[in-house]
C-alpha cells in the first residue's frame, strides 16, 4: 500500500499566493507520482480545530509536508504537534521566503517557484513546475528511505533521551474512518493467521495502512511463515520490519532465531552476541543465544540412519557447544528468574550433559534451577490456569525426573489447553525427540511423544497434510480483444501457445503430486489450466473480482466457447476457485486488483517453499507493468531461487 503523506499548508489565497493551486498543481501530483497517498484537511481550522480523521493522519502519516511560505497559524500548529509527538518524517517547503525560522530549520527543506499573474494571485511557475515536482518527489522518497538516519524534530534533537509515544497511544477514537480501515485490515490478518494462509498474510502485510502498521504486519507475516517452516521468507519479513524500525527488539530476536534455523550458526551467534551486549539484562536474548548454541549442537550429531549409540558418541564429542548453550540459558534465568523457558532448557541440557559424560558436575545448581522452574510455573498457572507453555514446561520437567504415569498426566494436562495449536505442540514434540534420540529416559520420553502425536493427528489428519512436490505459477497474455491496435495474442495463435505450454509442463514432469496457480482468464491462463488438469495437477484458480464481473472482464469478450471452457475447468474435481475480495477483502484504494491477484498467487506459491516453485509465463518480455506484473513476478521468483520458464511470444509467432 502507498505511504501516507499529510500536507500542512494554507488554504485559498493568502498574501497573494493561490495555495489551492500550489496543492493541486505542485504538491499533490508530485507526491502521488512518488507513490504516496496524499491527505489535506479540507477546510480551514477554527481556533485550532481540525477534523479528527485529518488530525489522526497528522500524527501517524509516514510523511508530513509543511508549506512554510507564510506565517500561517494553522500550519505552525500542525507542525508543532507533529514535532512534539514524532521525531521523523517531516519536510518543509517554501516559496518567496529567504529564510526559515531557526528552530524548525533542517536540511529537510525545499524551495519551489511561483509566478505572478496580475490581477490573479501567484501560482506555480509553469516554466519551473516539472523540475519542482521532480525535486519534491525525490526529496520525499529520500526522507522515507532515510527514516532512521537522523531525527528531524527539533524537540527530539534537544531532548535526546525523549522517546516517541507508541503509535497505539496516539489513537483518536473519534477518527472512525481511519481506525475502521485499520481494524478491517487487522481482522483480515488475523483471519489469515487462523486459516494458516501465509500467502494471504504476505499480501495484507504489503497493504498496511501506514508505516507504523507495517512493522506489526511484517512481524505477523514473519511469525506465520516461521510456523510453517518457511524460514527464508520469514527472515525477509523481519528484515522488512527492521528496515523501518532498526531497534525493534522482537524483530531483532526473530532474525537471530531464523538465521539459526537456516543453519547460519556463525552469523546467528554474531547477531545475537551483539544483541545481548546491547540488552544485557534481556532474558529472551540470552535464551535465544542458548537456542542457537543448542541447535548447532544438535545439528552436529543428529542424522538420518544413525543409531542411538552413534548419536550419543557424536554428541559427547561436541560437549563444548552444549556447555555454551547451558551457560546462555542459565544467564537468562538469572537475569529474569520468572523466565522459566530459560530455566527448563538449562535444566534439560544439564541432565543430558551429565548422562553423556557420566559426571554430575553441577548437581546443586541444577537442583536450584529445578525448584525455580517449578516455582515459576506455579506462579504462571495462578495467573492463567490454561497457560499451555506453563503446563508443558511442568511436563518437560517431569519427564526428566518423575515416573511414567506422572509424565503422562502432565502431558495430558498440557495438551488439554493446547487449543489445537500445531506450532506449540510440535515445539514440545521436538524437545521430547531430543531426549529419545540420546536414549535419555526413553520410556518416559516415548510416553510423552505418544500423547503429543495423538493431539497433532487430530489437528492434521492425513488427508489435510498433503504437500505438493512442485508448485507451478502461470502468468500470460489474454486472447486479444477484437480491434486491439497492437496484436499480442491473436486468436489464431491459440494452438501454438497451447502446444508450448503443454511441452513445458511435460518437460518439467508436471503430474498428480503437483499444485498449480493461475488467474482463469481466456488465453494463457485457460490453456495452462487445461494442460494442468489433463496431467492430474491440482489447480488453484484465483479471481481478482466476483465471478460474474471476472467473466465479463476477462473471459466473455473472447466468445462463448471460452466461457464454456471456464465452467468446464471449474467443475473439475481438482479445481478450487478463490475469490480475492472474499478472501482478502476489497482491493485498497489506488491499488491494481490484477497486480494484487498476481501477488496473491505468487506469495501463496512461495509459502510452500521457494525451491518448489516453477514460474511459467507466456510473455513478450515487455516490462514496465509494476508490482505484480509479469516482470516483477519473474524477478521475485528468481530472488528466492525459484525457477523461471519464459515462453517468449515474440519467438513463438
Residue ranges and their predicted role:
Residues 326, 333, 347-351, 407-421:
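TPR/TPR-like (Sel1-like) alpha-helical repeat modules
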Residues 108-192, 575-581, 585-590, 601-605, ...:
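C-terminal interaction surface of TIR/SEFIR-family domains
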Residues 173-195, 199, 210-227, 245-257, ...:
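Amphipathic alpha-helical repeat scaffolds of TPR domains
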Amino acid at each position: 500500500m502507498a505511504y501516507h503523506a499529510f500536507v500542512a499548508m494554507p488554504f485559498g489565497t493568502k498574501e497573494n499566493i493561490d495555495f489551492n493551486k500550489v496543492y493541486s498543481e505542485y504538491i499533490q501530483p508530485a507526491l502521488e507520482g512518488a507513490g504516496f497517498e496524499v491527505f489535506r484537511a479540507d477546510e480551514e481550522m477554527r481556533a485550532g480545530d481540525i477534523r479528527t480523521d485529518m488530525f489522526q493522519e497528522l500524527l501517524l502519516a509516514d510523511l508530513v509536508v509543511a508549506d512554510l511560505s507564510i506565517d500561517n497559524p494553522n500550519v505552525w500548529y500542525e507542525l508543532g504537534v507533529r514535532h512534539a509527538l514524532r521525531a521523523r518524517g517531516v519536510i518543509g517547503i517554501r516559496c518567496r521566503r529567504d529564510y526559515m525560522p531557526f528552530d524548525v530549520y533542517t536540511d529537510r527543506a525545499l524551495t519551489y517557484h511561483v509566478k505572478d499573474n496580475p490581477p490573479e494571485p501567484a501560482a506555480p511557475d509553469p516554466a519551473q513546475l516539472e523540475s519542482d515536482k521532480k525535486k519534491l518527489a525525490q526529496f520525499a522518497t529520500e526522507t522515507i528511505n532515510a527514516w532512521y538516519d537522523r531525527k528531524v524534530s527539533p524537540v527530539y534533537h534537544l531532548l535526546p533521551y525523549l522517546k516517541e509515544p507508541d503509535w497505539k497511544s496516539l489513537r483518536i477514537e473519534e477518527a472512525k474512518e481511519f481506525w475502521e480501515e485499520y481494524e478491517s485490515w487487522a481482522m483480515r490478518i488475523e483471519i489469515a493467521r487462523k486459516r494458516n494462509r501465509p500467502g494471504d498474510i504476505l499480501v495484507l502485510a504489503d497493504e498496511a495502512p501506514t508505516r507504523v502498521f507495517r512493522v506489526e504486519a511484517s512481524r505477523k507475516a514473519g511469525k506465520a511463515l516461521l510456523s510453517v517452516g518457511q524460514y527464508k521468507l520469514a527472515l525477509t519479513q523481519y528484515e522488512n520490519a527492521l528496515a523501518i524500525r532498526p531497534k525493534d527488539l522482537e524483530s531483532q530476536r526473530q532474525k537471530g532465531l531464523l538465521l539459526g534455523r537456516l543453519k547460519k550458526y556463525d552469523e546467528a551467534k554474531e547477531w545475537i552476541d551483539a544483541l545481548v551486549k546491547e540488552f544485557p539484562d534481556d532474558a529472551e536474548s540470552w535464551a535465544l543465544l542458548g537456542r542457537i548454541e543448542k541447535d548447532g549442537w544438535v545439528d552436529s550429531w543428529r542424522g538420518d540412519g544413525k543409531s542411538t549409540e552413534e548419536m550419543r558418541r557424536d554428541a559427547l564429542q561436541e560437549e563444548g557447544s552444549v556447555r555454551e548453550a547451558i551457560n546462555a540459558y542459565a544467564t537468562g534465568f538469572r537475569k529474569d528468574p520468572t523466565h522459566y523457558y530459560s530455566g527448563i532448557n538449562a535444566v534439560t541440557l544439564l541432565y543430558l550433559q551429565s548422562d553423556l559424560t557420566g559426571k554430575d558436575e553441577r548437581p546443586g545448581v541444577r537442583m536450584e534451577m529445578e525448584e525455580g522452574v517449578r516455582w515459576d510455573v506455579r506462579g504462571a498457572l495462578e495467573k492463567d490456569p490454561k497457560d499451555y507453555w506453563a503446563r508443558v514446561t511442568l511436563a518437560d520437567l517431569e519427564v526428566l525426573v518423575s515416573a511414567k504415569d506422572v509424565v503422562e498426566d502432565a502431558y495430558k494436562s498440557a495438551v488439554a489447553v493446547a487449543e489445537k495449536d500445531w506450532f506449540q505442540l510440535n515445539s514440545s514434540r521436538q524437545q521430547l525427540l531430543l531426549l529419545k534420540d540420546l536414549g535419555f529416559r526413553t520410556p518416559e520420553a516415548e510416553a510423552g511423544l505418544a500423547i503429543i502425536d495423538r493431539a497433532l493427528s487430530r489437528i492434521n489428519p492425513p488427508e489435510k497434510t498433503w504437500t505438493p512436490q512442485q508448485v507451478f505459477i502461470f502468468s500470460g497474455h489474454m486472447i486479444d480483444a477484437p480491434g486491439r491496435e497492437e496484436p499480442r495474442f491473436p486468436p489464431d495463435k491459440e494452438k501454438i501457445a497451447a502446444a508450448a505450454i503443454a511441452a513445458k509442463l511435460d518437460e518439467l514432469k508436471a503430474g498428480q503430486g503437483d499444485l498449480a496457480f493461475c488467474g482463469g482468464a481466456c488465453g494463457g491462463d485457460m490453456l495452462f489450466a487445461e494442460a494442468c488438469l489433463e496431467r492430474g495437477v491440482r489447480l488453484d484458480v484465483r479471481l481478482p473480482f466476483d465471478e460474474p464481473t471476472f467473466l465479463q472482464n476477462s473471459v466473455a469478450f473472447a466468445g462463448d466457447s471460452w466461457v464454456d471452457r471456464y465452467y468446464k475447468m471449474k467443475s473439475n474435481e481438482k479445481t478450487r476457485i478463490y475469490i480475492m475480495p472474499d478472501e482478502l477483502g476489497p482491493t485498497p484504494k489506488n491499488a491494481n486488483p490484477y497486480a494484487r491477484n498476481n501477488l496473491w498467487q505468487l506469495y501463496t506459491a512461495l509459502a510452500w517453499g521457494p525451491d518448489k516453485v516453477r514460474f511459467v509465463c507466456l510473455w513478450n518480455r515487455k516490462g514496465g507493468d509494476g508490482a505484480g506484473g509479469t516482470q516483477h513476478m519473474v524477478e521475485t521468483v528468481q530472488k528466492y531461487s525459484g525457477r523461471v520458464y519464459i515462453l517468449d511470444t515474440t519467438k513463438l509467432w
